[in-house]
Regions:
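Glycine- and acidic
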Residues: 6, 256-268, 323-325, 339-347, ...
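Active-site palm subdomain of RNA-directed nucleic acid polymerases
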Residues: 88-90, 405-419, 531-535
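Metal-assisted phosphate- and nucleotidyl-transfer catalytic regions
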Residues: 128-173, 410-489
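A translation/RNA-centric and nucleic-acid-associated enzymatic feature enriched
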Residues: 326, 336-337, 341-345, 354, ...
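Structured ligand/cofactor/substrate-binding pocket environments in proteins
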Residues: 268-277, 347-360, 380-386, 393-402, ...
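Auxiliary tRNA-acceptor-end handling modules of aminoacyl-tRNA synthetases
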Residues: 51-69, 90-94, 102-361, 365-371, ...
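Ubiquitin-like/PB1-type beta-grasp interaction modules and other compact soluble beta-rich domains
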Residues: 1-75, 79-97, 117-124
Length: 535
């Protein structure tokens, strides 16, 4: 077989080789630094055996995907250390994230002193340098394995997998975890790490579930890189809007009011009102008409839209379907309300496009572990809009929405600070989405072509679409490097049918419109946080 390397050079082998063997064949230094591999563009474990012609790239901690594998291994070392120090602790999940890693445990909260003790135990595990090995079990064997260990969260995760699925595990010495990988070859590869904080997080992000203890950490390929990151972290804390915003008397929070429910102080209100007036005036210039719709609705509305099936866990529900005649929910978005504004009258093809704008107060039941200052809250204000258009108008109107977003970013002086994302559906997760594959593929292609025509660099994110359509997400990083979505523009070819929306065409026949969901600067609270950290 012929292996093509990243630099274009080739290596020939008479028999199958593991990725780590190929790394050693290139150079011993590269093999020692290797964290994972790429085979034909797919990230794989170093233990993966290659048995046919392909392209192979060896990933180190200098590569984003290699660093993710290192951090994932660090999360396993963390979990082993916690269970050694706290034998009754139950393990949940422990992924790598953009800024490091975390692991969730069912156990007592950890103080800074406790985290320091866990760090010491992690260093012992790393020094021991246990070999990390991958193995598989059948679904039934995996469930039995974790039931015997009394690990209910792992059992639940496995039970959600399809029948007949082969389940992968990783062991480091005697400690074993359920995991898809990839991981380093040995715990000794985790050379530079730091546990940062501990907080609460509900299992699977739902307040109906057990509150777990989440431990955050970070890891790098060298101690110098870690030191530099920790120094940057200290500087970031000084610029954190959560600190500056309080010092500037822009907002505050109160425990008895609740997490994710900030009080905007008079100084903060002045800024948000200026933003609101500016956005509303700009939307009016661009042909938007204003609506004012209720803050709540019966569950029936969300059942029509599909939010009840696909988003209920993220909503605040008032009442019990089993005991109450009517159940209400605080609105997580404005779209279904504005559809009924449209349906209140009959519309001709000449009336379209119709552009509805509203400064909306919305409510979303966010995971407590994810909430921070003004960037992720449970009640927020947003410049929301929905455009009802004919299919032949869709591309032009979508481009105009992008232009409005870019204008707003330019005025705020932050257009250079954002990245564009084409958020697509995941064809492997059909329960998460409505509609047929051909509709998804067509609408995603329209957005891809538009972004290319507008010369906007973008990345494609599988599985990040709304349940009813793909979208453009315009994201920005906070002072800690975490990316938040600031502006969203969504292509919706499906909900008009759900709500039986139509217009009368030139032949007097009923036709389905298309819908664009969009924001101008997005959530005012998050925008305020962004501006505080920027300026």
């Amino acid at each position: 077989m012929v292996i093509t390397l990243k630099d274009g050079s080739k290596k020939e082998y008479a028999e199958a080789k593991s990725v780590i063997d190929i790394a050693y064949d290139i150079s011993e230094g590269l093999a020692r630094a290797a964290c994972a591999g790429e085979v034909d563009g797919e990230v794989v474990d170093l233990r993966t055996v290659v048995d046919k012609d392909c392209e192979v790239n060896i990933l180190t901690a200098k590569d984003e995907k290699g660093l993710a594998a290192l951090r994932h291994t660090a999360s396993h070392v963390l979990a082993e250390a916690v269970q050694k120090l706290y034998p009754d602790a139950k393990v949940a999940i422990g992924p790598s994230i953009d800024t490091g890693f975390y692991y969730d445990f069912e156990c007592q909260p950890f103080s800074r002193e406790a985290l320091d003790e866990i760090e010491k135990e992690m260093k012992k595990i790393i020094k021991k340098g246990a070999k990390i090995e991958r193995f598989t079990k059948t679904r039934e064997e995996a469930i039995a394995f974790f039931k015997e260990k009394n690990e209910p969260y792992k059992v639940e995760l496995i039970e959600d997998l399809p029948e007949g699925e082969e389940i992968s595990f990783y062991s480091q010495g005697d400690w074993v975890d359920l995991c898809a990988g990839p991981h380093l070859m040995s715990t000794k590869g985790v050379k530079a790490f730091k546990l940062l904080s501990s907080s609460g997080a509900y299992w699977r992000g739902s307040e109906k579930n057990q509150m777990l203890t989440r431990v955050y950490g970070t890891a790098y390929g060298s101690k110098d890189e870690l030191k530099e990151h920790l120094e940057q972290l200290e500087e970031a804390k000084k610029r954190d809007h959560n600190k500056l915003g309080r010092e500037m008397k822009l907002f505050t929070t109160v425990d008895v009011i609740g997490q994710g429910l900030p009080l905007i102080m008079p100084n903060g209100v002045i800024i948000m009102q200026e933003l609101q007036r500016w956005i509303e005036d700009e939307e009016t210039k661009r042909g938007y008409v204003r609506t004012k719709t209720p803050l709540m609705a019966k569950s029936d509305l969300y059942k029509i839209s599909g939010h009840w099936d696909h988003y209920k866990d993220g909503m605040f529900v008032l009442g019990d379907e089993e005991t109450d005649k009517e159940v209400f929910a605080l609105r997580p978005m404005t779209c279904p309300f504005q559809y009924y504004v449209y349906k209140a009258e009959q519309h001709s093809y000449r009336d379209l496009p119709l552009r509805y704008g509203e400064t909306s107060t919305l409510f979303r039941n966010e995971d407590s572990g994810e909430m921070h200052g003004l960037t992720r809250v449970r009640q927020f204000t947003i410049s929301e809009g929905h455009l009802i258009v004919r299919p032949d108008q869709m591309v032009k109107e979508f481009k105009d929405c992008i232009a409005l977003a870019q204008y707003c970013l330019q005025v705020l002086g932050v257009e250079e600070d954002v990245t564009y994302h084409l958020s697509k559906w995941d064809p492997e997760d059909k329960e998460k989405y409505i509609g047929e594959p051909e509709v998804w593929n067509e609408t995603e292609e329209h957005i891809r072509n538009m972004l290319q025509e507008l010369n906007i660099p973008f990345v494609e994110d599988v599985g990040e679409a709304a349940f009813y359509g793909p979208k453009v997400d315009i994201n920005a990083k906070n002072v800690y490097g975490k990316e938040d979505t600031m502006i969203t523009i969504q292509w919706d070819a499906l909900l008009a049918e759900q709500f039986d929306m139509y217009y009368i065409d030139e032949n007097g026949e009923k036709k389905r419109p298309c819908i664009i969901h969009r924001t101008s600067v997005g959530c005012y609270e998050r925008t305020l946080a962004w501006l505080i950290e920027k300026y």
